[in-house]
Amino acid sequence: MRYGWLIVGVCGVLCALGARAVEARGSYLFSYFIGNGEDGLHLAASRDGLTWEALNGGQSFLKPEVGGKLMRDPCLCQGPDGTFHLVWTSSWGEQGIGLAHSKDLVTWSPQQFVPVMAHEPGAMNAWAPEILYDAGASQFVIYWSSTIKDRFPETIAAGGDRIGQTGVICNHRIYY
């Protein structure tokens, strides 16, 4: 059975299918994580966008295996061929993100660690990635948030997130 889902990332970002798919098929899918993300990918479905039901009995669809073995901030996007693409925060302090693919949201490709900030030696993290398909350019776009040590010092005084109990201030910027 085929489902037409509007994919919604944990931050509420609409990823890639557009309103026509919702009108035609009337379903929403929400990707989320529990706790610190050790449990993996969770999905919930809704017919109206207001009432949500956890799928798979609330159990994870995919356990994290790469990076720091976390799956935080999962974002799904369905490509034009019907394949689902998943990106996620895979650790608190590494320079990459997780990536996996699925045709049915049950069977997944091997997970990949994508070192998106390896070219920046001072990069402290790669968090909250989002993926979308740009139909006009016929390509996927992935963007995320990273802090690069000692970059943008003029805004550090404004504060920011702290990494755990280290006291290190994260001065995030968006990269793609």
Question: Residues of each region from the PLM?
Answer:
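Bacterial N-terminal signal peptides
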Residues: 5-16
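Carbohydrate-active catalytic/glycan-binding domains of CAZyme proteins
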Residues: 19-176
